[in-house]
Amino acid sequence: MLTCNKAGSRMVVDAASSNGPFQPVALLHIRDVPPADQEKLFIQKLRQCCVLFDFVSDPLSDLKWKEVKRAALSEMVEYITHNRNVITEPIYPEVVHMFAVNMFRTLPPSSNPTGAEFDPEEDEPTLEAAWPHLQLVYEFFLRFLESPDFQPNIAKKYIDQKFVLQLLELFDSEDPRERDFLKTTLHRIYGKFLGLRAYIRKQINNIFYRFIYETEHHNGIAELLEILGSIINGFALPLKEEHKIFLLKVLLPLHKVKSLSVYHPQLAYCVVQFLEKDSTLTEPVVMALLKYWPKTHSPKEVMFLNELEEILDVIEPSEFVKIMEPLFRQLAKCVSSPHFQVAERALYYWNNEYIMSLISDNAAKILPIMFPSLYRNSKTHWNKTIHGLIYNALKLFMEMNQKLFDDCTQQFKAEKLKEKLKMKEREEAWVKIENLAKANPQYSLCSHASTVSMPLAMETDGPLFEDVQMLRKTVSDEARQAQKDPKKERPLARRKSELPQDPHTKKALEAHCRADELVPQDGR
């Protein structure tokens, strides 16, 4: 008979009847022995599968015995899937032990870059060399957990906190196939062992804390969040305080990490699940997102806009009122972003019917915040697609409340006139300074070295519409044109940036001459 003994972190297999090197034995099929002997043979096969083979340094070694183990694992998967009353009490410790021997191991150091440099679409993950055996061990253990014969009361002696902790450590594996099996395995354990649920949540929290505040690298964050999404969905109401703390202190800080793109869809799902459970959490969640809003990372900003729209899709009108002003101040900044994808994603909010109904109910607060940004960028944004989306948003605002739209237009004009007057005062102050400088007796000595010129303002808002009726007509026409344009097939062509024209810059460029034109040439 084969026995498996622990020696440190390695499993050493002994053959009781052999003095030479260990040789696995191809045992009979379980179905070929009498029912009375099947349990004994099942245990022998489980112990036989405790043998570990080298797939890394010498992949071609022991090919015969690797196949013996693979065949034994495949047979056991079929055996517990298609037979009832075969998971008896003596089987439990053998199954858990066999799983632990094969799976619980020290993971190799990461071969890919960490943090923001890691690109899951470009960087190839390191695949587990022993996967032909590991896959079957995972499949067998899952069938074991899912079997109608499985009894958690017996299994809890062997599937304990230590087992769960070692299982969670494997989530850092680079092999996505292994992480997928781990995700399903941990979810089954969470569902069947009520006494382990709080411990599992606590240990996942610890992994997230280390990831956020220490390492910023972990391969299994997306899978752990996917498990949590299912767990959150099952939380009873009202939510416990520990669950609210988990949202505010663990999930929301995950938005800070550079590698957010790797797990953002799963994170956004978890956040939205919480808000569907308890709408009073909306304000702290949105304010935290605004606090963590990316300043210089445009792709990450697009992710935040995606998540924010998902939140607005489930928000209660009473909660929307609490966050609308800081939220739309941020959206106004996004509309003004020179990165066209950020501006475009923000303007797509105006295509969402539920969001538009919320805006309509609170237009008196929202339109004054958004109008200056929309108007300015309708003239000056370099991307023509953005112009069309802005005119569409302005048209919707105009149809929503025409009087308010006209008031915002007049207010914007008044503010622009104030700015121009202020700029004129500054220019006059500079003229006075220049005149005082000219009155200085030393002025003539240094005037040839430098020329004092007053600062010049660059008009970036385009010409103001003097007539509100003209603005209305322009907005309607441009919005109508923008709806037609996307349907046209446009030829691929290199587009030149369209920047605001500053006449003073133009004159300075025309007056500019190269340094060698000023230096006298020999013989001239």
Swiss-Prot record:
- The answer, when asked if NAD is one of the entry's keywords, is no
- Protein name, entry field: Serine/threonine-protein phosphatase 2A 56 kDa regulatory subunit gamma isoform
Source species, domain of life: Eukaryota
Question: What functional role does this protein have?
Answer: The B regulatory subunit might modulate substrate selectivity and catalytic activity, and might also direct the localization of the catalytic enzyme to a particular subcellular compartment. The PP2A-PPP2R5C holoenzyme may activate TP53 and play a role in DNA damage-induced inhibition of cell proliferation. PP2A-PPP2R5C may also regulate the ERK signaling pathway through ERK dephosphorylation.
Whether Lipid metabolism counts among this entry's keywords is no
As for subcellular location, the record says: Nucleus; Chromosome, Centromere
**Which sequence positions carry the modification called N-acetylmethionine?**
1
Q: Which GO terms describe its molecular function?
A: protein phosphatase activator activity
Single GO cellular component term:
chromosome, centromeric region
The similarity annotation says: Belongs to the phosphatase 2A regulatory subunit B56 family.
**Family matches, as Gene3D superfamilies:** Leucine-rich Repeat Variant
Q: Which GO terms describe its biological process?
A: signal transduction
Q: What cystine pairs are annotated? A: none
Ranges spanned by the short sequence motif Nuclear localization signal, renumbered to the chain: 472-489
Known tissue expression: Highly expressed in testis, heart and spleen. Also found in brain and skeletal muscle.
Query: Mainly resides where?
Result: nucleus
Pfam families, alphabetically?
B56
What segment(s) does the record annotate as region Disordered? 476-524
Task: List keywords of the entry alphabetically.
Answer: Acetylation, Centromere, Chromosome, Nucleus
| Subunit structure of this chain's protein | PP2A consists of a common heterodimeric core enzyme, composed of PPP2CA a 36 kDa catalytic subunit (subunit C) and PPP2R1A a 65 kDa constant regulatory subunit (PR65 or subunit A), that associates with a variety of regulatory subunits. Proteins that associate with the core dimer include three families of regulatory subunits B (the R2/B/PR55/B55, R3/B''/PR72/PR130/PR59 and R5/B'/B56 families), the 48 kDa variable regulatory subunit, viral proteins, and cell signaling molecules. Interacts with SGO1. Interacts with SGO1; the interaction is direct. May interact with TP53.
